[in-house]
Amino acid sequence: MKQESSLLAKLANGSLVLQILVGIIAGVSLASFSHEAAKQVAFLGSLFVGALKAIAPILVFILVASSIANQKKNTQTNMRPIVVLYLFGTFAAALTAVVLSMMFPTNLVLVAGVEGTSPPQGIGEVINTLLFKLVDNPVNALMTGNYIGILAWGVGLGLALHHASDSTKQVFADVSHGISQMVRFIIRLAPIGIFGLVAATFAETGFAAIAGYAKLLAVLLGAMAIIALIVNPLIVYVKIKRNPYPLVIRCLRESGVTAFFTRSSAANIPVNMALCEKLKLHEDTYSVSIPLGATINMGGAAITITVLTLAAAHTLGIQVDLLTALLLSVVAAISACGASGVAGGSLLLIPLACSLFGISNDVAMQVVAVGFIIGVIQDAAETALNSSTDVIFTAAACEAAENKAKLG
């Protein structure tokens, strides 16, 4: 019995990244050995993602309300520089995608459109959807995972409780701590969940269908790699004036890997919160910036919208001048910030960007269908970039504020 508990303790305290790596290798091996067996363990991945998605809304709501209610007067939360970083990073991602798309123009083999999808008719509709999400019923927001609404009600409750008695504030702090403990437990199950996700993905797709879109994927993933490994570190260096790579690599390893396999920014919120706690960041800051980042920090989405739109334009023989490309960068960045307000995310915002070049909705929906074909890799890489960048920019802004305070 003692030996069993010792083994469990070793597993619980061992390197999570190493355990996830073992899970990935085991998942690929099982799918290679037996497709049927791999499909049988798919439920492990679904359970893991389901658990993260279930706890994320209540975690965000309680953590935001608790941190604002318990916030000391004159406490600096650094939210303005973080939001600026989010918006600048998203625009830089769109611009990078434009440059790469023009250097390596891609032709698409267009397929049938996606049935039953309804893309937004314009940027106004995207903003309108986001505004209505802001005033959603709080219970409905928690049930449906509407993080714009959850943030709004969490901030409102926190401000209302700011002048409450210390015992009331302590209750919220204790509940927040309890939920954080539950999150840590769920995150320790990541190797098992990722094993199920990897096995199911390889068994169901085998990535054969994706091979025909190798050049398109190379441009997409190349743009995302440039943002993750060159542009983001450069932005962080400007903020903190030291080598940014230890922070960037740690965030990619501890946040990006999990996000890659869960393919859900919402499911990765608890992982990012736990990482911010490990980095000893200010709770008042990250409890708001991380869920906000999952909503508006969409560099990966901006890349997807831009690359697929320019690929469609090139396929149809449409010449794109520099000014139009710049305008596309702005539209893609704004649209990407609203991706969380659209069912289907970044892919269903492609028709909006295609309308800049007079591309018909029928053709645009065929481009969306191409996006769904490569979605296994595109969506995973996009989520990994988006989610890890939330922590990178939050940490950079917090450290920059600390350095400024030390200098007086």
From Swiss-Prot:
It comes from the Bacteria. It is found in: Cell inner membrane. Signal peptide: none annotated. The keyword Cell inner membrane applies. Keywords: Amino-acid transport, Cell inner membrane, Cell membrane, Membrane, Symport, Transmembrane, Transmembrane helix, Transport. This is Serine/threonine transporter SstT. InterPro entries: Na-dicarboxylate_symporter (IPR001991), Na:dicarbo_symporter_sf (IPR036458), Ser_Thr_transp_SstT (IPR023025). Its main location: membrane. GO terms for biological process: serine transport; threonine transport. The keyword Transmembrane applies. GO terms for cellular component: plasma membrane. It is a multi-pass membrane protein. It comes from Shewanella sp. (strain ANA-3). The chain crosses the membrane at residues 11-31, 43-63, 82-102, 141-161, 192-212, 216-236, 290-310, 316-336, 363-383. GO terms for molecular function: neutral L-amino acid:sodium symporter activity. Belongs to the dicarboxylate/amino acid:cation symporter (DAACS) (TC 2.A.23) family. It catalyses: L-serine(in) + Na(+)(in) = L-serine(out) + Na(+)(out); L-threonine(in) + Na(+)(in) = L-threonine(out) + Na(+)(out). Pfam families: SDF (PF00375). Involved in the import of serine and threonine into the cell, with the concomitant import of sodium (symport system).
